[in-house]
Design a protein with these regions (language model features):
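Mobile, glycine-enriched helix-loop/loop "lid" segments at the mouths of ligand-binding/catalytic clefts
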Residues: 192-220
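Repeated scaffold domains used in trafficking and secretory/extracellular systems
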Residues: 287-291
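Acidic/polar, solvent-exposed loop segments in beta-strand-rich repeat domains
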Residues: 110-122, 138
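Conserved strand-loop elements at the edges of beta-sheets that form or border functional pockets
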Residues: 94, 158, 294
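Blade-edge beta-strand/turn elements of extracellular beta-propeller
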Residues: 2-22, 59-83, 122-162, 215-233, ...
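Acidic/polar loop patches that form or flank catalytic/metal-binding clefts of enzymes
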Residues: 136-141, 175-178, 197-204
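Acidic, Gly/Ser/Thr-rich repeat motifs that build Ca2+-stabilized beta-propeller blades
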Residues: 1-111, 165-185, 198, 233-271, ...
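Extracytoplasmic, non-cytosolic globular domains
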Residues: 117-130, 154-187, 191-192
């Protein structure tokens, strides 16, 4: 949908309801505007189809009406997701390098039963990095597993359960990844945007603890989170953005996040691999937070499962 000059337009820009599935955790998961959207009017859409597979397709605005997408989309990525209807991933977004990044869940089920997240031959439980200048996509030569037998060259990072949102912070040269835990810990990872081939640990670890918690584990080569919290505080992390707006300059550089069950709003700063200056904001009764948004001015928005959208402002 498009909100234009404060008014919600009657006709949706794009309707995928006939092709998509909302079973389990499926549905329309995220969208990303091409960096040259003002010129090419390309929108990349991340959703699950009726078979439960993870798709990314490119749509363009109609020549007749720029507020409505052309009917036919261009296929970009199709990832089979046949076993479970949860852990479909996360987000599609363009990085500062102009590449398209896609986070995928581990394929679902408790404890990653198919062992996808640590399998470099699978695209599940990963962050993928793609060059979409020519459809469907090309593999960037700088991806970490290019030309390595048995390893998918699309992979940028791995060892993720279901990263519910990731966000780039170009001024800080950082990538923030919020990964939903199994039954013990929720985690936030923050790494340099240039860091590739990182293993975030799942299902060897869940946050900062071994998985399962009763077992010993080898953490060699694993990238630890900058922050994790237990399920006394929530059950499913929702990652946001680093604030870079002008309305509240004192918040510049803070990463905002929430939790679907906790209902709170928190922020932190990232410094040398550590979460600092953590703040729990006084969020009015709002609903289960499912996502965040960021406008062209760097101001942030919070979205709830009850359909509410609110902008974060100074009280």
């Amino acid at each position: 949908r498009i909100v234009q000059n404060g008014i919600l337009l009657a006709a949706p820009f794009l309707d995928l309801s006939a092709r998509g599935s909302t079973a389990g955790e499926g549905g329309l998961l995220s969208v990303a505007l091409h960096p040259e959207f003002a010129v090419n009017r390309w929108l990349f859409v991340h959703f699950t189809n009726t078979a439960g597979d993870i798709l990314v397709e490119r749509y363009a605005a109609s020549i007749v009406d720029p507020n409505i997408a052309q009917t036919a989309g261009t296929p970009i990525v199709a990832i089979p997701h046949p076993t479970f209807n949860n852990h479909n991933g996360g987000r599609v977004a363009f990085g500062p390098d102009g590449m398209l990044y896609l986070s995928t869940g581990d394929g679902g089920g408790a404890g990653d039963p198919d062992r996808n997240a640590q399998n470099l031959g699978s695209l599940l439980g990963k962050i993928l990095r793609l060059d979409v200048a020519v459809p469907p996509y090309m593999i960037p030569a700088s991806n970490p597993f290019v030309s390595q037998a048995g390893r998918r060259a699309e992979i940028w990072a791995y060892g993720l359960r279901n990263s519910w949102r990731f966000a780039f912070d170009p001024p800080g040269a950082s990538l923030f990844i919020a990964d939903v835990g199994q039954g013990q810990r929720e985690e936030i990872n923050a790494v340099p945007t240039s860091a590739s081939g990182l293993n975030f640990g799942w299902p060897v670890t869940e946050g900062t603890i071994c998985f399962p918690a009763s077992a010993a584990c080898d953490r060699t080569g694993l990238q630890p989170p900058i922050l994790d919290y237990d399920h006394a505080q929530g059950c499913s992390i929702t990652g946001g953005y680093v604030y870079r707006g002008a309305a509240m300059p004192e918040l510049a550089g803070r990463f905002f996040y929430s939790d679907f069950c906790g209902g709170w709003l928190r922020s932190l700063r990232h410094m040398s691999g550590t979460a600092t200056e953590r703040v729990n904001w006084n969020l009015p009764t709002f609903g289960a937070v499912v996502s965040f948004g960021e406008d062209v001015f760097g101001e942030l928005y919070v979205l709830a499962s009850n359909g509410r959208v609110a902008r974060i402002v100074r009280n």
